[in-house]
Structure formats: structure tokens, C-alpha cells
């Protein structure tokens, strides 16, 4: 028989811990929402200062959240034009993600029986390969084209390995699952094998460097990637009548000429956010109903369906959707759902089995405390089962692009955002000085509409 006085002290500490843990995880969720608000309003410097202060105090972003913190800092500094700083944070995140994945595979499924919010955030697979895209852009801004191409190759490789990575993780969990969970760990194949964004960047960079053969190969890969990507995003169904007529079920022709020296990228919308979905799952072996909380991706619906590029009174062209990052994220995340669901069910089973001794405690010894323990056990199962809603909040949702040639000189370029009806929504302006000694002049805009 356990020492009741000791148990009373422990149950009090448990209740206090549950309260503190619940507050901490919700506080992080709230902070992530504030980051999204700042990104929407383009208050990047303010968000950077806020993140730096929160890391110093260790009240919100703890060591287990370091990957998330570095991803946010990398993206916000990129938006703010601090490209070297941005790459420092992205490199920190890249290294930590690789270490976290190795650790998760070696530990197996039982490393995740606690609440995910208590564990190190190891990043989503799509977050891992998109960080290389923004590292590549940072290097272009720093005029380090070779380094940019290295990051593009890393991105392409990691996308190519997605199915192998997820299947390997699922097999590891399935082999270590001994709780009679009856979970189907098999992940479905991902319909993401390539990246139009990565191939488009590579084709433009090789063309600018005069590497004709490499540019041709990347152009072929780009066309293949676009053919695979457009059915995934069902782009034509998202457009209004005026835009649909010119793009119905067609992959757009992209200018990848050898003389292009201006590359324009417009990032629109925002990343899909994770929301909690609570389920009640009946387990036949344990003959009980289990509470399972799942993080579900909720897509952000952008109002922007195209971008017109103007130089003075001249329309230089239309930037049409190059890659839907949030659709790619949704596809990758959907394939990973058996793993997410399986981990949640195993947590629920472990909590259920771990609190069964309470029901067998003789009430005549201390009926009040026995009842209190039962309540505490139920409270633990309910409160501790909170979905892990951590995700890269500042990541954009879509990428639009256009490339063309300008003679040396100073120009003001207008990015005119077009809505689904084909009407102008908003305009942003960028100044550029074309220097014939510089092979690529990259201009970016970001509008989270």
C-alpha cells in the first residue's frame, strides 16, 4: 500500500505542474499568433525584437523550441533584408533538425509517450526543405551564386527523399509499438517529388552564369515539376473568369532566357496553421474510450491570384503562381498523419493504463483522497492531451515569379497584385540599379493577403 501522505504531496505537485504546463503551451501558441499578426502588417523589426526578448527570458521559447525560434528568426530577418543574419538562424535550425531526426529514430516510439508540447520541436519535413530555399535566396542577395546553388541541391535532395524518410520513421514506430494499439502506421506516398521553385531558381542562376547545359537540364526538370505541381494545387479552379480563360488547365510559359538579369519573386498569403481536433477513439483491447488530440493543418486562403510587373508605363509581364507552399505542406502533412495519429493514440493508451491503479485503491483508507486521486487522474488525461500546434508561422503561402532583362540604369518596378476577379488589389514598388557586372538582380516582395 503506498504512503498516503506522500501521495497527497505528489498529487498536489501534479496539479500544480499540470496548471503550469497548460499555461506555458498556450502562451507559446499565443506568441505564434502575434508573429503572424506582425508578418501580416509587415512589422518585421518589431517581431524580431519580441522574439529576441522572449528567448532571453526563457519564458516562452525554451530550449525544446529552439528549432522553431531559429526558423522564425531566419524568416523575419530575411523579410527585413538582413540576409547574413537570416542564414545564421537557418543554419542553426538545419543542424538542430538533423540532430533531432537522428535522435527520434534511435529512441523509437516510446520517446513520444509524453505530450508532444514537452518534447523538442523537430520541424515538419516541408519546413526542413523550405529553409534551404530561403537560404538560397539569401545567398543570391549576397551575390554568392555558387552557395545558392548548393542550397537548391539540398532542397531538391530532401524532397526526393521524403517518402523514404517518412516510411523509415513509420517502420521504426511500428516495430517498437507493443501496447496492442492496432495502429496502422503506414504512410501514403507523397505526390511531391520535385519543386518548381527550386528548379526555376536553378535554371535562372545557371543561365545567368552562362552554363547553358546546366540551365537546359534545370529547364527540363522545371517543366516536369510544373506538370506535377499544377494538378496538386488545382490552380485553374481557384481563378476568376478573367484569369481562368488564359490559364485553364495549362502550365504557364516561363521566361528563362539566357539574357535575363532581373528575377522578381512575390511571396503571398501565409503558411497553413495547426489547429486542434479532439477525437474520442474506442480501443477494443483496453475496452475504453480514449481522448486523442490531433494537430490539423488549416489552410490560409490568399486573396492574391496573380502579380503584374510594371516598369513605368510598360507592362513587363504577368507573374503567375510558381509554387503553392501551403499546398505542398498540406500534401506532406497528410502523408505523415498516420504517424501523428499513431503517436497520439499511444499517448492516450499509456495515460489510461498508467492511471488504472487509482480505481483499485481501497476507499475505506481515505475515501476523500481516493476520490481526489481519481479526479486528478482524469484531469491529467484530459489536460495533458493537448495537440502540439507549433509550426513555422512566418512562412509564406505562395510564390509568384517573373524574370526579364533590363539595360543598365535605375528603375522603379511596380508589383501590382491581382485578385481572383482579375482586378488590382494592391501595389508595391521597388527600386533597382542594374549593374552589368552583376549577373542576377533579385527583388522580393511579401504581402500576406
Where would I find each of the regions flagged by the language model?
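Bacterial Sec signal peptide processing site at the extreme N-terminus
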Residues: 23-41
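Boundary/linker segments of alpha-helical solenoid repeat arrays
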Residues: 60-64, 97-108, 160-170, 223-244
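Short loop/turn and low-complexity linker motifs enriched in small/turn-promoting residues
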Residues: 244-449
